[in-house]
Structures are given as C-alpha cells and as structure tokens.
From Swiss-Prot:
Keyword annotations of the record: DNA damage, DNA repair
Record SUPFAM superfamilies: DNA damage-inducible protein DinI
A Gene Ontology BP annotation from the UniProt entry: DNA repair
Gene3D superfamilies, alphabetized: DinI-like
InterPro entries per UniProt: DinI-like_sf, DNA_damage-inducible_DinI-like
Highest rank taxon of the organism: Bacteria
Protein name according to UniProt: DinI-like protein Z3916/ECs3483
Keyword Transcription regulation on entry: no
Length: 82
C-alpha cells in the first residue's frame, strides 16, 4: 500500500523540525499492524490531500488511513518528542 499525504506548504513550514519524519514513522507503525508493505510519503504541496494506492480494498483502506491519520494527529503529544 502506498499512502501519499500532501500538506499545504504554509502549514508544513510551521511544523517543528523532525515532525514530518516522526509522522511518517508513526503512521507506518500504526498502519502496518493491519496492512503489509506500507509506504508512507509526506510532501509539501499547494493544498492538503490524501491518496491511497496499491491496495485491493481501496475504499476501506482509505477510510482506515483517514481515521488513523486523524488519531495520529490528535495523539501527537504522546509520540512526537521535539
């Protein structure tokens, strides 16, 4: 599964150093519990976005990734140490 998270450039510049790598690691850890061969890409773009590809159950996988991403952001104080 390939997960591409696009974060608006103006938001990305406000993130603390190391936040993008920490987010990739945490999402990979959480999503790998349910799916094999997970690749998470986080990049700066003009708009926020999410795409999930290379999976047979695309709709349910995207829903799972959206929920996991939301939970990961909410719990950032628990896993992100800067």
């Amino acid at each position: 599964m390939r997960i591409e998270i696009c974060i608006a450039k103006e938001k990305m510049t406000k993130m603390p150093n190391g936040a993008v790598d920490a987010l990739k690691e945490e999402l990979t850890r959480r999503i790998s519990k349910r799916y094999d061969d997970v690749e998470v890409i986080v990049k700066a773009t003009s708009n926020d976005g999410l795409s999930v590809t290379r999976t047979a159950d695309k709709d349910s996988a995207k829903t799972f990734v959206q929920e996991t991403l939301k939970d990961t952001w909410k719990s950032a104080d628990e896993w992100f140490v800067h």
